Each structure stands twice: as structure tokens, then as C-alpha cells.
């Protein structure tokens, strides 16, 4: 059975306040995106890796790979107008049957245990996402103000979100709507239940300068 990691990296670094897109920023002397690809290659050296990048960033990425001697084999697909369209472009390169894990390119600290958990469960469950507990108090905004809600009723969603390849391709044949905030929401729109597994709290999404400081501390 074929395993594929589809790494989506379309950020422009606006929230980071940097001219360099966040996926290319260095942590410990190595670009974030390289560390992300390494995590999946470490889990399964035979895994197909597809990187989705805006076309205008692809030459720079190749230069970075040459500069760092980065030789993990991967295919590159063009980023789309939205994350939905980027994933759809990447899926066009997926070979054969099996499972596909879609992962944010700026989440380099996903653990090997979480990757394994998601990919192994997806063989049986067909649709699996990692989540972590909400540890802060949560308030719901209302027209009259706000109210406390039970944090036990909520989870924070991470990636990789892993699905049966055929199921995922069919899901992405649906027409795009703004309600598709992640891959699980696309699959759920077909009436398919999504199974939750435990994520790892270190699996942060690096989007701000503070996140970059945390990432450096995690090395």
C-alpha cells in the first residue's frame, strides 16, 4: 500500500513580518520546510513526498536544496488560489491506492508517534486527524457580549490529516466553499465521519515571530 505525504507550503510570511516566506526561515540553521520533509522521510523512506509551493517560490526552493545539500526525493506541485486548490493540485500527483497525509509545511515538530498513529489508523478508519486538548478557558462571542463554554467540548486540530487516497480525491472533486477550512471539513462534506487521534503539543504551526522563538527552543 502506497503512503504519500502531501506537504502544503503556500505562506508569504505576512504575519511573520518577514520578506522571506515563513516556510523558508531557518531554525537551527536549516529552513523550516526541510525539517518538515525530513520528519516524514524519517518515518518511511519509501513514502512518496509531494511538496505544494507557489510557482514563484519553486526556483528559490531548489536553490535552498542545493545550498543545504538537501537530497530527499520529492515532487513539486503548483500552489493554488486557496489551500483547497493547492491540495487539489497536489493530489493530481498521487500515485496508486493507499493513504495520503496532508501536512502544513510549517509544522516541523510533528512526532514520529503521531505520524505513525495517523497513517496506521487511516488504513482502517479512512479519515484520521490529530488533535490536542484545549487548556485555556474558552469564551463564545455573542451579540450581547460573550459567555464561557466548556473546553471539554472542543479540541485543537493539527496535521497530518490522513485519508484513504481514493476517498480524498473524490472529496476534492466537490465545488469549493469558504467552509472548507481544512481537509477534514472537505471529507466531512461527503458525510464521512472523521476519527480523532492524539496529537503532540510540540507540533506547532510556525506563523509568528513568537512561534519562531518557540521553535528554536524545541530543537
UniProtKB/Swiss-Prot annotation:
**Catalysed conversion reaction:** 2-C-methyl-D-erythritol 4-phosphate + CTP + H(+) = 4-CDP-2-C-methyl-D-erythritol + diphosphate
In this UniProt entry, which residues are annotated as the site Transition state stabilizer? 15, 22
Site entry (Positions MEP for the nucleophilic attack), positions: 151, 205
The UniProt entry, under Gene3D superfamilies, shows: Spore Coat Polysaccharide Biosynthesis Protein SpsA, Chain A (3.90.550.10)
Output one GO MF annotation.
2-C-methyl-D-erythritol 4-phosphate cytidylyltransferase activity
- Pathway this chain belongs to: Isoprenoid biosynthesis; isopentenyl diphosphate biosynthesis via DXP pathway; isopentenyl diphosphate from 1-deoxy-D-xylulose 5-phosphate: step 2/6
Signal peptide segment:
none
Name of this protein: 2-C-methyl-D-erythritol 4-phosphate cytidylyltransferase
In Gene Ontology terms, what is a biological process of this protein? isopentenyl diphosphate biosynthetic process, methylerythritol 4-phosphate pathway
The record's section on PANTHER family has: 2-C-METHYL-D-ERYTHRITOL 4-PHOSPHATE CYTIDYLYLTRANSFERASE, CHLOROPLASTIC (PTHR32125:SF4)
State the species of origin.
Bacteroides fragilis (strain ATCC 25285 / DSM 2151 / CCUG 4856 / JCM 11019 / LMG 10263 / NCTC 9343 / Onslow / VPI 2553 / EN-2)
Task: Cite a single Pfam family from the UniProt record.
Answer: IspD
Report the function annotation for this chain. Answer: Catalyzes the formation of 4-diphosphocytidyl-2-C-methyl-D-erythritol from CTP and 2-C-methyl-D-erythritol 4-phosphate (MEP).
- Mind telling me which CDD domains this protein's record contains? CDP-ME_synthetase (cd02516)
Q: What is its EC number?
A: 2.7.7.60
Q: Which UniProt keywords apply?
A: Isoprene biosynthesis, Nucleotidyltransferase, Transferase
Amino acid at each position: 500500500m502506497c503512503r504519500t505525504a502531501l506537504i502544503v507550503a503556500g505562506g508569504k510570511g505576512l504575519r511573520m513580518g518577514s520578506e522571506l516566506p515563513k516556510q523558508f526561515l531557518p531554525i537551527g540553521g536549516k529552513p523550516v520546510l526541510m525539517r518538515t520533509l525530513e520528519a516524514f522521510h524519517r518515518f518511511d523512506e519509501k513514502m512518496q513526498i509531494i511538496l505544494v509551493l507557489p510557482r514563484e517560490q519553486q526556483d528559490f526552493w531548489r536553490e535552498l536544496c542545493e545550498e543545504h545539500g538537501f537530497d530527499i526525493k520529492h515532487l513539486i506541485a503548483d500552489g493554488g488560489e486557496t489551500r483547497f486548490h493547492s491540495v487539489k493540485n497536489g493530489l493530481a500527483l498521487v500515485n496508486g491506492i493507499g493513504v495520503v497525509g496532508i501536512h502544513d509545511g510549517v509544522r516541523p515538530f510533528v512526532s514520529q508517534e503521531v505520524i505513525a498513529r495517523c497513517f496506521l489508523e487511516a488504513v482502517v478508519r479512512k479519515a484520521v486527524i490529530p488533535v490536542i486538548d484545549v487548556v485555556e478557558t474558552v469564551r463564545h462571542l455573542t451579540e450581547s457580549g460573550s459567555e464561557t463554554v466548556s473546553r471539554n467540548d472542543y479540541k485543537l486540530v493539527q496535521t497530518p490529516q490522513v485519508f484513504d487516497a481514493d476517498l480524498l480525491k473524490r472529496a476534492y472533486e466537490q465545488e469549493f466553499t469558504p467552509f472548507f477550512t481544512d481537509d477534514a471539513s472537505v471529507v466531512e462534506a461527503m458525510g464521512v465521519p472523521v476519527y480523532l487521534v492524539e496529537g503532540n503539543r510540540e507540533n506547532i504551526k510556525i506563523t509568528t515571530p513568537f512561534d519562531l522563538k518557540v521553535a528554536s527552543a524545541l530543537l
